[in-house]
Amino acid sequence: MDRQKALEAAVSQIERAFGKGSIMKLGGKDQVVETEVVSTRILGLDVALGIGGVPRGRIIEVYGPESSGKTTLALHIIAEAQKKGGTCAFVDAEHALDPSYARKLGALDELLISEPDAGEQALEIADTLVRPGAVDVLVVDSVAALVPRGELEGEMGDNHMGLHARLMSQALRKLTGSVSKSKTIVIFINQIRMKIGVMFGNPETTTGGNALKFYASVRMEIRRVGAIKDRDEVVGNQTRVKVVKNKLAPPFKVVDFDIMYGEGISKMGELIDLGVKANVVKKSGAWFSYNSTRIGQGRENAKQFLRDNPAMAAEIEGAIRQNAGLISEALAAVPDLDGTPVAE
């Protein structure tokens, strides 16, 4: 009884000093169990993430080799958030964002774009936007391009050991609290580097030290695994995403989809692939059929048929969403990015 009174006195003192809500019970009325999400606009990836999209109030890392679709994925998330009336910002440290491509993917003219000179400036802008809860989604493209001011002002060839990692570590310590309170999704796009002298295991690593690996609630590895051809012309990429880390659902799910040049992620190709996995679309040889109706010979013809018949496409999507659990199991059995099966 004395311990209970002591606890109540301690809680009361904490609330007087730091404000109501500074300490709460796990099962208290103030706690919200449901995680709010924003869809990635990729049906398979929403299923692979386990919660239906990327979580609000969390830090997300998207990394992969060059031209693998990292910025395209981030722009799709921005487009979805804007469609629901949200405000989004894009901190373009690489100075490489193509506004016309962003519009094609569905980004609206209200998207805030910043092209900072130094890494400190970029992260200060991010912190200023996140702290008051002014934005719903903030993308930093990319961590590798966040050049510390000391490096910018120094001579070419100067050694700046650990400066970049120190900058990221400090920024994430500041950001993580305000990201959670403001329910902002902060997406860091990152590049891959090779570790020298690694004889066994994966020599690849991401830039900016280890801090982002710890602070990120979701880490997604994105890679180009093949080309999509129309006769001899390459018209898109076959892309694979692996959920490397997930604090909100089981990780290591893998999903494949198509990115078409000038168009973005192909929804129809995904409906066919996931439809086959969920046993909604039947495949017999090269033919695809739905409810005994043949929809095309070959994947590209089936995609075109669904484009011409949006009602059937919507019906297939509804059936896939109902079979999300079945698809989730199938995604866990997809081969890893290096060809080995993913451990469940």
UniProtKB/Swiss-Prot annotation:
<dbReference type="InterPro" id="IPR023400">
    <property type="entry name" value="RecA_C_sf"/>
</dbReference>
<keyword id="KW-0963">Cytoplasm</keyword>
<dbReference type="GO" id="GO:0006310">
    <property type="term" value="P:DNA recombination"/>
</dbReference>
<dbReference type="InterPro" id="IPR020584">
    <property type="entry name" value="DNA_recomb/repair_RecA_CS"/>
</dbReference>
<keyword id="KW-0238">DNA-binding</keyword>
<dbReference type="InterPro" id="IPR020588">
    <property type="entry name" value="RecA_ATP-bd"/>
</dbReference>
<keyword id="KW-0227">DNA damage</keyword>
<keyword id="KW-0742">SOS response</keyword>
<feature type="binding site">
    <location>
        <begin position="64"/>
        <end position="71"/>
    </location>
    <ligand>
        <name>ATP</name>
    </ligand>
</feature>
<keyword id="KW-0233">DNA recombination</keyword>
<dbReference type="InterPro" id="IPR020587">
    <property type="entry name" value="RecA_monomer-monomer_interface"/>
</dbReference>
<dbReference type="GO" id="GO:0009432">
    <property type="term" value="P:SOS response"/>
</dbReference>
<dbReference type="InterPro" id="IPR049428">
    <property type="entry name" value="RecA-like_N"/>
</dbReference>
<keyword id="KW-0234">DNA repair</keyword>
<protein>
    <recommendedName>
        <fullName>Protein RecA</fullName>
    </recommendedName>
</protein>
<dbReference type="GO" id="GO:0140664">
    <property type="term" value="F:ATP-dependent DNA damage sensor activity"/>
</dbReference>
<comment type="similarity">
    <text>Belongs to the RecA family.</text>
</comment>
<dbReference type="Pfam" id="PF00154">
    <property type="entry name" value="RecA"/>
</dbReference>
<keyword id="KW-0067">ATP-binding</keyword>
<dbReference type="InterPro" id="IPR013765">
    <property type="entry name" value="DNA_recomb/repair_RecA"/>
</dbReference>
<dbReference type="GO" id="GO:0005524">
    <property type="term" value="F:ATP binding"/>
</dbReference>
<comment type="function">
    <text>Can catalyze the hydrolysis of ATP in the presence of single-stranded DNA, the ATP-dependent uptake of single-stranded DNA by duplex DNA, and the ATP-dependent hybridization of homologous single-stranded DNAs. It interacts with LexA causing its activation and leading to its autocatalytic cleavage.</text>
</comment>
<dbReference type="GO" id="GO:0006281">
    <property type="term" value="P:DNA repair"/>
</dbReference>
<dbReference type="GO" id="GO:0003684">
    <property type="term" value="F:damaged DNA binding"/>
</dbReference>
<dbReference type="InterPro" id="IPR027417">
    <property type="entry name" value="P-loop_NTPase"/>
</dbReference>
<dbReference type="GO" id="GO:0005829">
    <property type="term" value="C:cytosol"/>
</dbReference>
<dbReference type="Pfam" id="PF21096">
    <property type="entry name" value="RecA_C"/>
</dbReference>
<dbReference type="InterPro" id="IPR003593">
    <property type="entry name" value="AAA+_ATPase"/>
</dbReference>
<dbReference type="InterPro" id="IPR049261">
    <property type="entry name" value="RecA-like_C"/>
</dbReference>
<dbReference type="GO" id="GO:0003697">
    <property type="term" value="F:single-stranded DNA binding"/>
</dbReference>
<keyword id="KW-0547">Nucleotide-binding</keyword>
<dbReference type="GO" id="GO:0016887">
    <property type="term" value="F:ATP hydrolysis activity"/>
</dbReference>
